[in-house]
UniProtKB/Swiss-Prot annotation:
Native source organism of the sequence: Debaryomyces hansenii (strain ATCC 36239 / CBS 767 / BCRC 21394 / JCM 1990 / NBRC 0083 / IGC 2968) (Yeast)
Name assigned to this protein: ATP-dependent DNA helicase CHL1
Pfam families: DEAD_2 (PF06733), Helicase_C_2 (PF13307)
PANTHER family: ATP-DEPENDENT DNA HELICASE DDX11-RELATED, DNA REPAIR DEAD HELICASE RAD3/XP-D SUBFAMILY MEMBER
Chief location of this protein within or outside the cell: nucleus
Record's catalysed reaction(s): Couples ATP hydrolysis with the unwinding of duplex DNA at the replication fork by translocating in the 5'-3' direction. This creates two antiparallel DNA single strands (ssDNA). The leading ssDNA polymer is the template for DNA polymerase III holoenzyme which synthesizes a continuous strand; ATP + H2O = ADP + phosphate + H(+)
Taxon lineage: Eukaryota, Fungi, Dikarya, Ascomycota, Saccharomycotina
Length: 820
């Protein structure tokens, strides 16, 4: 362990042990985070990408945690049983308990020291591979696709009486407890840090950032390692050679559980109950994982070396862990947290990239299904039933037939309403109407949903149909839909009062949608149980949506908001709202944006800008459709020809498989000495999130219009109605209800703007100019919803900038950069 001479001291002289000399804005951010944790607050933090947000989160939260452990964990931890004992006896007893806990923690650190010095993870000894008896092909073809016998409630034996949704997981968790070792890990601190982000790559980046840090020990006279456990789905951590190759997470989950329940083909990697050798390997896995910071890939390699399942073995160390990194879905779903045995009580919850949190929560608890999808599911179920009807027990046969009946009822409901023209886009569906005039209401949907979850029939049928697809080239589009019907029935069984069923019409397709409209109730359980919840992101503005729709029950004084500036010098950024050119006003609203004269003058204005701007420029359009409209007008008027004479033009493809090549070509063009390029992108497309346009890749960023979502989409119609009804239910007027709905709609748009233009400045020496093309960017209301670091650099407040002034300032800006 290195020397902890930190050069980072906050305004209150608190050490944060930052690995580098922090900037003032980083210290301010760390102070704000520390304060939110210390005072049990909700935190909303905006820190632009490139300002060291992740390290600031790590350093402030870990500093607080180590101080808390030192001051609280190793004090009086138990009360004396007898109230009659003298006070000095009680204190002596409590001190003994605290010292004993501290000694155990110190012993474990020494064990990790020894492991670190004597074990190379790449050379860890492994068990000899077991010889697995291979079934004959015809046996595999039949037996592997048949579920275990299924029994109704009245026939349940002891096996099914205890078979709750998470029973398989809970059983496995008990397997990794193992016998007591000489040196067991210990952590009596009730507080943990849960760091959650959207993608696997973002969580890996967090692991790498965490690896750069070390913190003052909460123990006496001995360094203390950071105890870190990254969690992931089976798709990332399964090491079974066959199951790990399945295409989707649902298939992998069901295949794993199915293999564990099999009496013939159990998984050789699963920790074995009451097996000393297996328990020792699980403990070795856990201990080795704590010798240093490991990411998901490291744990996968370690599991392979030890021939033990990393998905389950990583749980061995959860109790001693200080920081847990996990994807959104694992944190946000109560059923998943229960299955993983994750206790978030009194913990610090950090959600990164939280600008899309409202959408993520809604999408997790939302589902849609079409008539064609139901037809495909029904065909697969019938095909499977005909094949295996003689080999299925009565419970399986009856439930599959009930499921077929249910799918047919749903399909007929959609078809009959479509033909009669009764459907209005976004209209609510009353669930009782679905079964009106049918015998479908006699089917117990709750029991069907139970059957789908317990029997893993979706995986069985998918596996069988996939085998047919591989061997007989039978096209089968419905495989993933079997998991979709499971989710749909769950919503149908337990429709939340915070959500609604409604109609959606897209082209010729009609679907029944269920959408969670109020995410605050789902999120309330996390807020209630955690010590504090911190939402962080590079573009969190406008923040009002979080207070209004995620924390409406939290008093304003309990919510700490902080939006920090950028680390770049003030002179490295300019922002120009542009409202017109050649006496043609720019307003790219839905009813005005196809005006050919405006599109032509837009091209001329952009030509002026690119002639004054070195290197690359990224232009963001509101949609692929509008980008194509503009390109057609520009081609017809030879504007493309004029633009190409100045810079090479690259266009974002709608096909995601082609994005990487376009980006590579754009990048190499800008990095050459003789050429530069223009990249035409789409807000919400592949290039507006997660891709960094630093340095010569984006000396200019141009935003065309305000990218409002489709107000006529079924989702937005349902959401607008919900906001208006909720406002009126709380005593608001109809006028206030309409304003609230409009603000929500506007905020979706402005978050997308902030996310896109935030791609340009990526580090302290970077510089760029942002051009906002639309006269609406001149209004105070829109300008106030820009990210703080963008808003403070607006060249004109409350109005647009004269275009001649824009060109003059652009030329001066880059002239200074070339001279400097």
């Amino acid at each position: 362990m290195g020397n902890l001479e930190a050069n980072d001291v906050g305004n209150n002289s608190r050490k944060y042990n930052h690995p580098f000399e922090p900037y003032d804005i980083q210290i301010q951010l760390m102070d704000a985070i520390y304060d939110a944790i210390d005072n049990y607050k909700i935190g909303l933090f905006e820190s632009p990408t490139g300002t060291g947000k992740t390290l600031s989160l790590i350093c402030s939260s870990m500093t607080w945690l180590r101080e808390y452990k030192k001051n609280s964990t190793f004090r009086e931890t138990e009360d004396s049983e007898s109230e009659d004992e003298p006070e000095w006896v009680k204190q002596a007893y409590q001190k003994t308990i605290a010292n004993r806990t501290k000694v155990r923690a110190q012993e474990y650190e020494r064990l990790l020291d020894d492991l670190s010095e004597n074990y190379d993870v790449s050379k860890v000894s492994v068990l000899p591979e077991k010889k697995v008896k291979r079934q004959k092909p015809e046996q595999e073809q039949d037996e592997n696709f048949i579920p275990a016998d299924y029994y109704s409630d009245s026939e349940l034996d002891s096996k099914y009486e205890n078979d709750k949704l998470t029973s398989e997981i809970n059983e496995l968790l008990s397997r990794v407890d193992g016998p007591k070792e000489t040196v067991e890990p210990v952590n009596d601190c009730p507080v943990k840090i849960f760091f959650s982000s959207r993608t696997h790559s973002q969580l890996s980046q967090f692991s790498h950032q965490l690896n750069m840090t070390e913190f003052e020990s909460s123990l006496d006279n001995i360094p203390e390692r950071i105890k870190f456990s990254p969690l992931a789905s089976r798709k990332q951590l399964c090491i079974h050679p066959k199951i790990s190759k399945l295409s989707n997470v649902s298939s992998i989950n069901d295949a794993c559980i199915d293999l564990q329940q099999s009496s013939k083909n159990s998984c050789e990697y699963i920790p074995k109950l009451h097996n000393t050798q297996s328990e020792e390997i699980v403990k070795k896995f856990s201990d080795l994982s704590f010798t240093k910071i490991h990411d998901i890939e490291d744990l996968g390699k370690l599991g392979n070396k030890l021939k033990i399942c990393p998905y389950y073995s990583v749980r061995k160390g959860i109790d001693v862990t200080e920081i847990i990194a996990l994807p959104y879905q694992m944190l946000l779903q109560d059923s998943t947290r229960s299955a993983l045995n994750l206790n978030i009580d009194d913990s610090i919850i950090i959600i990164d990239e939280a600008h899309n949190l409202l959408d993520v929560i809604s999408s997790i608890y939302s589902v849609s299904i079409t008539s064609n999808e139901l037809s495909d599911i029904t065909k697969s179920l019938k095909f499977y039933l005909n094949k295996f009807i003689k080999r299925l027990n009565s419970g399986n046969r009856i439930n599959i037939m009930k499921l077929i009946k249910l799918c047919q009822v749903l399909e007929k409901f959609i078809s009959s309403n479509s033909k009669d023209g009764k459907i209005k886009h976004g209209d609510e569906i009353i669930t009782s109407d679905i079964f009106e005039g049918t015998t479908g209401d006699l089917v117990n949907i709750h029991k069907i949903e139970q059957f789908l979850n317990k029997s893993k029939i979706a995986y069985k049928i998918e596996s069988y149909m996939q085998k047919l697809n591989d061997s007989e080239s039978i096209k089968n589009r419905s495989n993933p839909l079997l998991f979709k019907i499971t989710k749909f029935l769950k919503c149908l069984t337990n429709p939340s009062k915070e959500g609604k069923f409604f109609w959606d019409k897209t082209n010729d397709s009609v679907s029944i949608n269920y959408m969670l409209l109020d995410p605050s109730e789902i999120f309330r359980d996390i807020v209630k149980r955690a010590r504090c919840v911190l939402l962080c992101g590079g573009t969190m503005e406008p923040m009002n949506d979080y207070t209004n729709y995620l924390f409406p029950y939290i008093p304003p004084e309990q919510i700490k908001k902080f939006s920090c500036g950028h680390i770049i010098p003030q002179e490295n950024l300019e922002v120009f709202p542009i409202g017109n050119y050649n006496d043609i006003s720019f307003e790219f609203s839905f009813d005005k944006r196809n005006n050919s004269k405006m599109i032509i003058e837009l091209g001329h204005a952009i030509l002026n800008i690119i002639e004054s701007t070195p290197d690359g420029i990224v232009i963001f359009f509101p949609s692929y459709k509008y980008l194509n409209v503009v390109m057609n007008v520009w081609r017809q008027n030879k504007i493309i020809e004029s633009l190409t004479k100045v810079k090479a033009i690259f266009q974002e493809p709608e096909d995601s498989s082609k994005v990487e090549k376009v980006l590579n070509d754009y990048s190499s063009t800008n990095k050459s000495e003789k050429h530069s390029a223009l990249l035409l992108s789409v807000v919400g497309g592949k290039m507006s999130e997660g891709i960094n346009f630093s340095d010569e890749l984006a000396r200019g960023v141009i935003m065309i219009g305000l990218p409002f979502p489709n107000i006529f989409s079924a989702e937005l119609i349902a959401k607008r109605k919900f906001i208006e009804e909720s406002t009126i239910a709380k005593g608001g007027t109809k006028s206030q209800a309409m304003v609230n709905a409009k603000n929500f709609y506007e905020n979706i748009c402005m978050r997308a703007v902030n996310q896109s233009i935030g791609r340009s400045i990526r580090h302290k020496n970077d510089y760029s100019i942002i051009y906002l093309f639309d006269q609406r960017y001149g209004s105070d209301k829109i300008q106030d919803k820009l990210s703080g670091w963008v808003k403070q650099k607006l060249f004109t407040r409350g109005r647009c900038t004269d275009f001649n002034q824009v060109i003059k300032e652009t030329q001066d800006f880059f002239r200074q950069k070339l001279l400097g």
